[in-house]
Each structure stands twice: as C-alpha cells, then as structure tokens.
Amino acid sequence: MSRHPLVIVGSGPAGTATALALHALDPALARDAVVLEKARHPRPKVCAGGLIPAGKRWMEEHGIALSVPHVTVHRAQVTTPRTTVAHDERDLCYVIRRNELDAALVDACRARGIAVREQEPVQALTRTGDGVRVSTPAGTYDAPLVIGADGAGSVVRRRLVDGGRDNIARAIMADVPVAGTRWDGYANARYDFDFRLLRHGLRGYLWAFPCTIAGVPHINIGAYALAPSGAPLDDALSAYLHELGAGVPKRVAFPIHWYRPGARLAAERAWLVGDAAGVDPLMGEGISLAMEYGDIAAAAVVAARRSGDYGAALYQQALEQSWLGAKLRRLHLATRLFYGPTSRFCFPLAERSRRLRAVGLRWYNGVDGWDRRSGWSAVAALLTNRIGA
C-alpha cells in the first residue's frame, strides 16, 4: 500500500491535464500524486481526433508543443437540412490521432516527474475514514482525494459519485484511406459536417475529417447522435460512406457521456473531469474541454489541500461558476436550439450570415478568448463587424 495526496484514475487528456495543471500550481504536490492507466501507451483510442484551437493553446500555455502528426484544417463544409455552406478560416482545427496525442501528454507528465502507472486497471474503490482506497492488480493506493478521468464509462463516477447513465450519446466511426474515394477534403484542408440526420429525427450529424495514419492520408468518417439513435444511425453512416465512395470499412461504435446542467460532478473525496464529468452535447467534442476541466480541478485540489475540505461543493461550485461551466451550459442550450423544433430557424440564420458563423466558430473554438466573453460581446461584434478584436 502507498499513500499519495491525490490519485487520478485515467491518463487521457483529462487526467494528464489535471496532473500538468497541478504541476504548474504546485510542482511538489503533483510529483507526490499518481496517475493510474489501465492500458499501456500508446494505446488505441476511438475518437475523431479533432483538437480545436483552445486545446492547442492550452498545450502551449503548459509548455507542450503540438509535435504529433496532425492535419490542420482551414475550411469547413456544412450541409444543413436545407443546403450546403462553405466557410474558410485559418486554423479551424488540428486533426490528431488520440493514441499519439495521449502518449505525448503522458511523456510531458513524466518529464515533470509526475508518476503515471500503466497497466493498472482499477479493481475496487473503497471509502476509508480519511479518504479513498484504490485497488489495482499491482497494489493499493490511499489518498484523501480521487479524481475520475476515466472516460464515458467512468468507474469513479459509477461507484463513488453518480451511477446514472441517462445522458449518453452514441457515435460510430471508420478510418478509410483517401485513395480510391470521392472525397476531396484532405487535398483542400477541409472538414465536413452534415446535419441531414435531423430530417430523419436523429439529433446529431455526420462528419468527415482529414487525418494521417502511419503517414498515409485517411478520412475519419463518423456519425454522432443523442439517444435514442440505434439502427437509424448505422444506416445513415452506411449511406454517407457510400456517398463518399468509401466502401464498407470496419466500424467502431462508442458512447459519449455529455454534460447535463445540474448533474453531480463530485462527491465527498471523489471528483470527475473530462468525459467522466461530461463533454459538449452539441458536437461531442471533448479533448479541449478535458484540458480545461484539468485547470479547474487542479486549482480546486490546491484549495482543498490548504483547507482540508475535499467535499463535493468545493469542486462542483468552482466548475459551475467558471467560464467553462458557462460554456457547457450554453452548449447544452445550443443542443436544444439546433436539434429541437427551433432548428428550422437557427440553421437558416447561420446559412445566411457569414458574420454569425464566424462569431459562432470563434466562440466554439476558443479563439481570441471568445468562449470567455459575454453574450453582449457577441451581439456587439455582430453589429459592428469587429469579430477579430
């Protein structure tokens, strides 16, 4: 048995970001903590791999260059239920492979002296008098606080925080070599979003992202929808693959745990970050949000360490009162607007106004701090055309 001031379960972007952000605030505390990973890096990870500018900025602010292979996207093609719209803007997204990005973030942790212990899946979580005991095949770890960064099916969430699974979306994806398809997005540094799913009662979209796998140009093609989706989502992806001339590739389905306002994100001595807490319900994006969760959790860990209060309220309130909490609530509202009855008004507005699209993208991508601004700032930018300020 070993004792640590903090155990982080999971070494994806949320877990490593929490450790790295903690190191920026209190290096000694971060080096005394431990990050547990059930697999060994680089490990397979099912994800479209879209890293938005906010995520790249987070990495740079923490001294980590985006050195893994990636495709930079400068153009978007969006098909709405009515028409298709093109939008050009520099650095809209960086499409990475999660096995490579996650391994790079783990390397960054280790370079700072943070312990990441691989092939240690959590077998048991037991509350003790003054903390939580985490049991793995290699041993036990006692800590006053455990942070669950262990994804959509989080063991920490189910056993210590909240066993509910009502806010789970579904995604299916496939990787297809560009050669032999009819898709020109890779050559044009473009990603595509297709919202025609709404015509069939599905609340979500289809996507095609340019990516590189072992140096070979590929398309990551997928479908995302809030529940219920089921067979219609599979059928929609099949039709999209045929439309792009992508054949019948192997597909992988995966759950996405999305953020629901008011959901429990913490319990006594157990907090959640990243997918375990909840990602963007509108698009299912989680990488950059995972990093931002890490900043807030790290600051709360330092505060808890000083006060001795590891209760749920400290972290829950810190998150809800932060700009990230506000962004997640707005994304939840946007889900209702774009995937509900009001979609017939929202999509036409975006189709007609490039200025509105630019503001929306900059807000979503976190460019120039847009995601931390008030709604009045957006209105002023739309009226004055001062979007880049």
Segments the model singles out, each with a brief description of its role:
Residues 302-389:
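C-terminal helical "tail/cap" subdomain of flavin- and related membrane-associated enzymes
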Residues 9, 148-149, 272:
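Redox-cofactor binding/interface segments in oxidoreductases and associated redox assembly factors
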Residues 21, 108-246:
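Predominantly flavin-linked oxidoreductase catalytic cores and closely associated redox partners
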Residues 124, 225-300:
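FAD/FMN-dependent oxidoreductases across multiple families
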Residues 7-11, 20-46:
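Glycine-rich FAD pyrophosphate-binding loop
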Residues 39-62:
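Conserved N-terminal glycine-rich FAD pyrophosphate-binding loop of Rossmann-like flavoproteins
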Residues 56-106:
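A conserved beta-strand/loop capping segment in the N-terminal third of enzymes
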Residues 15-16:
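N-terminal Rossmann-fold NAD(P) dinucleotide-binding loop
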